[in-house]
Amino acid sequence: MLWILVLFALAASASETTTGTSSNSSQSTSAGTTNTTTPSTACINASNGSDLGAPQLALLAASGWTLSGLLLIFTCCLCCFWLVRKVCSCCGNSSESESKATHAYTNAAFTSSDATLPMGTTGSYTPPQDGSFPPPPR
């Protein structure tokens, strides 16, 4: 969880730095005419309508909305996987562990040789093998 916060902080500082430098250098005066471009159109003008290059892709990858989008996709995939696992119970052993605990509890009386004696009795006790549970009172 901490690395996600670190990525958000890095993305925020990177986008802050790049927008600050592009807005400062976007105003240029040549031969008495003023050409002002906004940071949103500077990237489009720099690419001349061609495919995005490595610097543009790096800037896009470092932006905050891309990281939050990836975080949203990761969260959705994780929730969907958890939901499918709960509904189908084919990938994990969540319901299997409950059934194992139940069977271990019920089978202990029939298979254990050192079963505890009922209160108030002395001597040895053998659990019934015919499936009757609990044992009849003495």
Swiss-Prot record:
Organism: Human cytomegalovirus (strain Merlin) (HHV-5)
Pfam families per UniProt: HCMV_UL139
Protein's membrane topology: Single-pass membrane protein
InterPro entries reported in the protein's UniProt record: Herpes_UL139_cytomegalovirus
Stated name of the protein: Membrane glycoprotein UL139
Signal peptide: 1-15
A cellular-component GO term for this protein: membrane
Annotated compartments: Host membrane
Keywords from the UniProt entry: Host membrane, Membrane, Signal, Transmembrane, Transmembrane helix
Segments traversing the membrane: 64-84
Compositional bias of kind Polar residues: 113-129
Region of interest: Disordered: 17-37, 113-138
